[in-house]
Amino acid sequence: MPAGVSWPRYLRMFAASVLSMFAGAQVVHHYYRPDLSIPEIPPKPGELRTELLGLKERQMDSQKQ
């Protein structure tokens, strides 16, 4: 008995934690929408854009006001 609980309860809790982890990863994946394309030629240093465009737009809007 791991952690002082019965095996069926332990397995249920383990399954619930794994499923919630997968669901959370899916939500984050859909929210950020990563670019999964692989370029033919790797970008040169300083060429790769990694900033969040929505955040950048909000910051520019707040600076204009």
UniProtKB/Swiss-Prot annotation:
Disruption phenotype: A complete loss of mitochondrial respiratory chain complex III resulting in severe growth retardation, lactic acidosis and early death. Highly expressed in skeletal and cardiac muscle (at protein level). The chain crosses the membrane at residues 10-32. GO terms for biological process: mitochondrial cytochrome c oxidase assembly; mitochondrial respiratory chain complex III assembly. It is a single-pass type II membrane protein. Keywords: Membrane, Mitochondrion, Mitochondrion inner membrane, Signal-anchor, Transmembrane, Transmembrane helix. Residues 1-9 are mitochondrial matrix. It holds the Pfam family DUF4516. GO terms for cellular component: mitochondrial inner membrane; mitochondrion. Its main location: mitochondrion. It is found in: Mitochondrion inner membrane. The keyword Nucleotide-binding does not apply. Belongs to the UQCC6 family. Required for the assembly and stability of the mitochondrial ubiquinol-cytochrome c reductase complex (complex III (CIII) or cytochrome b-c1 complex), a multisubunit transmembrane complex that is part of the mitochondrial electron transport chain (ETC) which drives oxidative phosphorylation. Mediates early complex III biogenesis. Participates in regulating the levels of electron transport chain proteins, and therefore energy supply, in response to changes in energy demand. Also required for cytochrome c oxidase complex (complex IV) assembly. This is Ubiquinol-cytochrome-c reductase complex assembly factor 6. It comes from Danio rerio (Zebrafish). The gene is uqcc6.
